[in-house]
Amino acid sequence: FGSLAQRSAVSRNTINRLLDTIPRNEDSLVVFDINLRQDYYDKDIICKSMERCNILKINDEELVELGNMLGYEDIDFQDKCWILLEKYKLKTLILTCGINGSYVFTPGKVYFQATPCVKVEDTVGAGDSFTAAFVSCLLKGKSLADAHLAAVETSAFVCSVKGAMPVLPLQYVK
């Protein structure tokens, strides 16, 4: 779930009712893609959403904005991620940084993947494809490292073609 879908009180309540039905155990995956866009969010909605998820997906620009919102302006990006991981009891925090790679933080461990070099046609859909590939791999029982690599490769492919939802070649759907 994300913040954009929570602009309306009706959809926000629906999302929260759905989240209420999810068992809170080690096997559940509750992914919050923060999506801080324009003025479509507020601190209360963001904080409550982070309390409801166990996987947070955020990009580097959103991390700066969130850090400012929570009073973490003068803290380096990795420390912000560790603080968020602990404060919100997350099992995973995914930080995407565009051409500067991406990080997956878990309690006690961080993974880094460089961004593949591609000719960028369109970045719309890059974050969503990253999240979808990552979660799809986890649901298939793949390791965090394998999920991270698949997410990076899928997102890079999406950036190399026009449109947010290209047909993925079979190598990305394994």
Residue ranges of predicted features:
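Conserved beta-alpha-beta core of the PfkB/ribokinase-like small-molecule kinase fold
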Residues: G2-D79, G101
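Conserved phosphate-binding/catalytic region of the ribokinase-like
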Residues: D20-T21, L70, D74-K174
